[in-house]
Amino acid sequence: MATITFKNGEEYMLKLTRLEKEAVEKVCGPAIHDGAKVVADAIRAELQNVPTDEGWGTQEHPVVGPKKTQKAALLGTLGITSMQKDNDGMYNVKIGFDGYNNIRSKRWPQGQPNQMVARAIESGTSWMSKNRFVGKAVSQVKKQALAAMQKRAESEINKIMK
């Protein structure tokens, strides 16, 4: 009958236990943030390519893009949230736009919400042509983001398992 002998089995079990305890904080978190950084950088690059238009759009003649101040505000407020666990037990970060720009009006006394401006650019409106910068960026770098996440996760696992 064949037998199997494990040498240093207890040491290996301790490493696996430590990996289990530290997996979320030291492996998953950095890996998810590395992937999100790749995507956020791609969104920023695509946003810089969006044309600006200082005119007023109509349904017959929509503007081709946002005003320069709107675009600058979006570039300045693009960010990544901290990692959170959702109801299904999945860990996520969100990439998005925060705050308000400097274009004030009766409707927006604080300034226009940057999330609203980004959505208007991405989807278009009756007075602005759509410029798909988020969807385009995400589809272009999806594989790169996954590769960055895998590389970071493997590196962190190797550090813990040493």
What are these model-derived regions, one by one?
Residues M1-E25:
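N-terminal, Lys/Arg- and Ser/Thr-rich interaction peptides
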Residues E11-K15, A23, A73, M116, ...:
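Exposed alpha-helical structural elements
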Residues E25-S123, S155, M161-K162:
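Short, low-complexity, charged/polar segments at coil/turn and helix-coil boundaries
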Residues Q112-K162:
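Lipid-handling modules and contact-site tethers
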